[in-house]
Regions:
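A glycine- and charged-residue-rich anion-binding loop/surface
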Residues: 1-371
């Protein structure tokens, strides 16, 4: 059985150990500082004698350090395992933040936690509610950051299953036998096998990032620690850049963007009207029934009333086509669809689609078929 040294010394970054087994999947050690995946927290990564391992997993009573190349190791070797501490500490902060948020949700707002996920960018907490007002979640953000500033102690207690059940925890206990209780002093108490910071102050900050519905429940989204700081800074840079781009004060960016969007809508309508007028004039001029158009094919649709037309237009590097005519005549084109590289269809008298051929080649080929 691997000695779980990460429980004894959560802040230990390196330790010596003996290799107990070597497998194609990785190494087993006599003891480790590397936390294995569990409880929504990903496994640690790092180096064993300078050789990187990418993950840490529970394998029964043993802990596997996932490694691509184990050829230099053998059972009995004494090795030094070193954590990717930045990665580990990031998830210690995030896991502690999750306990803090879930505890405050339950104690202050009566909201239970169903599941959690600690990702590379965000922390998510699925709640037992089908609806939560936005101002409740913003208040929760304030409460969490207040608790961070207060620096509540975080510590562990080991006790029997029956003792733990008598504590009235906010979630049921999922393990048999003795239970490890994580306590955020004055805030939360829960059974958990994860690794946490020693104080809420080490979380740094918590930022509410939104919510979404999943399985009929509200899932809340958060950023913590360095992630929250990085997002705050990137948002500030974005606002500053938009302010310069729109020549507007930071508090006027939204209004400036709305004006720009409205101008863009008006320009699109003006352009659409001009294209349709150009298409109308082109058709009225007695043009060839097969031609390449400078206007989008949609501009012709309001003006096609009679006759037969095959029109092409290239947009975004693709040859679009429009055929106005009878079902029987379109059947001639469909018969040669492979040769024409045609895709699309429709219903008489209007058919349209795209072709892999250039406009010039497509028009020449269609002219031969429909002549």
């Amino acid at each position: 059985m691997t000695e779980m040294y990460y429980y004894k010394e959560p802040y230990a970054k390196s330790i010596s150990a003996t290799v107990t087994a070597v497998t194609p999947k990785g190494l087993y050690l006599s003891r480790t500082v590397s936390y294995p995946e569990g409880g929504g927290q990903p496994g640690d990564r790092g180096w064993i004698e300078g050789v990187p391992y990418s993950d840490t997993l529970h394998e029964g009573d043993e802990i596997l350090h996932v490694m691509k190349d184990t050829s230099r190791f053998k059972a009995g070797d004494t090795v030094t395992i070193t954590l990717d501490w930045e990665h580990r500490y990031d998830y210690m902060q995030q896991h502690t933040a999750q306990h803090l948020l879930s505890g405050l949700m339950f104690t202050n707002h009566g909201i239970g936690t169903l599941s959690v996920h600690q990702g590379e960018d965000i922390l998510t907490i699925e709640t037992d509610r089908g609806e939560i007002e936005e101002d409740v979640l913003l208040k929760l953000e304030d409460e969490a950051n207040r608790a961070i500033n207060e620096g509540h102690r975080v510590y562990y207690r080991e006790m029997s299953h029956s003792e733990a059940e008598g504590l009235g925890l906010r979630r049921s206990i999922k393990v048999d036998g003795d239970v490890r209780i994580v306590v955020i002093e004055g805030v939360d108490m829960i059974a958990c096998g994860g690794i946490h910071t020693a104080s809420t102050s080490e979380i740094g900050e918590i930022c509410y990032a939104g919510s979404e519905m999943i399985r009929g429940h509200v899932r809340t989204i958060w950023r913590t620690g360095e992630r929250a700081k990085a997002k705050r800074r990137s948002d500030a840079a974005l606002v500053k850049g938009l302010s310069a781009l729109l020549s507007a004060r930071e508090d006027s960016i939204l209004a400036a963007a709305e004006r720009l969007a409205e101008e863009n809508r008006q320009l699109k309508w003006t352009l659409k009207a001009a294209e349709e007028k150009g298409a109308e004039i082109l058709l009225a001029s007695g043009c060839d029934s097969l031609f390449s158009s400078p206007y989008p094919l949609s501009a012709f649709q309001p003006h096609l009333k009679d006759g037969e037309y095959f029109i092409t237009h290239t947009e975004s590097g693709r040859t679009g086509w429009l055929f106005f005519g009878s079902q029987e005549r379109f059947a001639l084109l469909k018969k040669e669809a492979a040769a024409l590289a045609l895709k699309g269809g429709g219903r008489a008298p209007l058919f349209q689609g795209v072709s892999a051929l250039s406009e010039e080649v497509l028009l020449e080929s269609v002219r031969e078929i429909l002549r």
